[in-house]
């Protein structure tokens, strides 16, 4: 039976390959249906390659090893991402390496480990592998080499084996040579992102966003790329816009890492103590931003999709709604390989990585969010803390209360979010109250219409 036919059966009947289907050849990574990196054509390389000496990834907090490290090895990482870092491969001198991935995962001990997962649809082993498959699938779409030429040069399965090994290729949005950067330094070194053109600023402004996460207006004497406050996409699953850089900065502070990403956003690509390029991506993958659950929690079934979605099969541990969180993509999977970008690429990559790990993809119709009746932003629940309008007119201290619309001070509804985030609610309520007094005008409050400000 040919490898191509086996692959067809796996996908057509939603089957998974047993983990022991891989045969180690001793020198290389896994060989078999999903091949290995050494059998792939070399990727295009950009830049001069990694330096001979550098600052390697380290963790100032010395976090203990994650359970992920017990099963996802350096050999597996380097087999899956041989073309990382603009084609040069994993390197501890550059943003993407197993060491950087390992350190980042230690800050998220639930990632790829099945900790605090209660679904009975999949085994603990299947859950942890599906978690990694989803994260890597989104990285393929966001920063993969995505070399369509492989499908004209190789048989279909062999082409897929190399295509989906192209993750963590790009550093910057629009890479490998980004139009957001100076044409003379277009993104072939991590430091190239220290300044940008006006198109790369990605500065979102409103009264509340500017209060919490103001953009830097600093410039340098470089007419081709004069701006320092550049919040375009960086990292494996690219975070973008000042409010995401700012929220990531807030989280870093909560784990004893002080860094000013609003002033120096390119530290996401250059900081190595700890390395932030993969950590920023894991933070985005693991963290809910109401009304959006964390992608991880959707994969693990730790979310509440609502009655209408549940009746349509969109509940529990599924993949499809995760595509809503990054780019609101619900166009489904293309029939041919490699297909186009967007949700189709995410789905195909998710299938490939699950095949590699020997884990199931889940019901076919839930791989896309296209038939999901109620999208994430329309599921009714409390989402943020806002001034308590029921008491703001009273001559008593101002308070905040959960509101059914979004904001930058999150409320984690206990019916929709995991307990670890619900535990943040009391602190977030106090934060909201502080901002009411610090800047009441952004809530359209003053001492005349809101007597509580006098107390």
Give each language-model segment a name.
Residues 98-108, 230-311:
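Alpha-helical segment that forms one wall of the substrate-binding/catalytic cleft
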Residues 131-136, 226-227, 231-236, 275-280, ...:
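Extracellular structured ligand-interaction cores
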Residues 222-225, 265-267:
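Short secondary-structure capping micro-motifs at structural edges
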Residues 2-21:
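Cleavable N-terminal signal peptides of Sec/SRP-targeted secreted and luminal proteins
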Residues 16-219, 224, 291-455:
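Cell-wall glycan-active module
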Residues 1-4, 453-455:
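A positional/structural detector of protein chain ends, strongest at the extreme C-terminus
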């Amino acid at each position: 039976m040919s490898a191509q036919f086996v692959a067809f059966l796996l996908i057509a009947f939603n089957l998974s390959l047993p983990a022991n289907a891989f045969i180690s050849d001793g020198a290389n990574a896994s060989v078999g249906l999903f091949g290995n990196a050494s059998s792939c054509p070399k990727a295009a390389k950009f830049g001069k390659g990694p330096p001979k000496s550098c600052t390697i990834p380290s963790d100032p907090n010395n976090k203990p090893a994650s359970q992920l490290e017990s099963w996802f090895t350096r050999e597996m990482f380097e087999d899956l991402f041989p073309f990382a870092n603009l084609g040069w491969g994993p390197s501890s001198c550059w943003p993407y390496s197993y060491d950087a991935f390992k350190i980042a995962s230690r800050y998220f001990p639930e990632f790829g480990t099945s900790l605090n997962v209660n679904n009975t649809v999949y085994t603990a082993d299947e859950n942890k592998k599906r978690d990694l498959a989803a994260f890597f699938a989104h990285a393929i779409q966001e920063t993969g080499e995505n070399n369509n030429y492989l499908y004209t040069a190789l048989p279909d399965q062999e082409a897929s084996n190399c295509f989906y090994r192209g993750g963590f290729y790009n550093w910057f949005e629009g890479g490998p040579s980004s139009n957001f950067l100076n044409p003379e330094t277009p993104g072939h070194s991590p430091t190239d992102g220290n300044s940008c053109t006006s198109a790369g600023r990605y500065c979102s402004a409103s009264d509340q966003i500017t209060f919490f996460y103001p953009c830097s207006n600093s410039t340098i004497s470089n007419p081709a790329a004069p701006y320092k406050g550049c919040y375009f996409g960086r990292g494996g699953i690219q975070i973008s816009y000042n409010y995401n850089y700012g929220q990531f900065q807030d989280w870093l502070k909560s784990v004893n890492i002080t860094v000013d990403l609003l002033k120096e956003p390119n530290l996401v690509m250059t900081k190595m103590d700890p390395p932030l390029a993969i950590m920023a991506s894991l933070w985005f993958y693991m963290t809910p931003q109401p009304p959006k659950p964390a992608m991880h929690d959707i994969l693990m079934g730790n979310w509440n999709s609502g009655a209408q979605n549940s009746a349509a099969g969109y509940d529990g541990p599924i993949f499809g709604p995760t595509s809503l969180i990054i780019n609101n993509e619900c166009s489904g999977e293309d029939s041919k390989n490699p297909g186009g970008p967007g949700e189709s690429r995410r789905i195909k990559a998710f299938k490939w990585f699950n095949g590699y790990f020997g884990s199931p993809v889940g019901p076919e119709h839930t791989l896309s969010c296209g038939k999901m009746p109620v999208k994430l932003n329309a599921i009714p629940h409390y989402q943020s803390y806002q001034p308590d309008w029921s008491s703001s007119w009273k001559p008593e201290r101002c308070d905040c209360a959960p509101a059914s619309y979004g904001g930058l001070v999150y409320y984690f509804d206990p019916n929709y979010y995991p307990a670890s985030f619900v535990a943040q609610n009391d602190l977030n309520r106090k934060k909201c109250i502080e901002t009411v007094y610090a800047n009441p005008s952004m809530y359209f409050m003053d001492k005349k219409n809101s007597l509580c400000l006098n107390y």
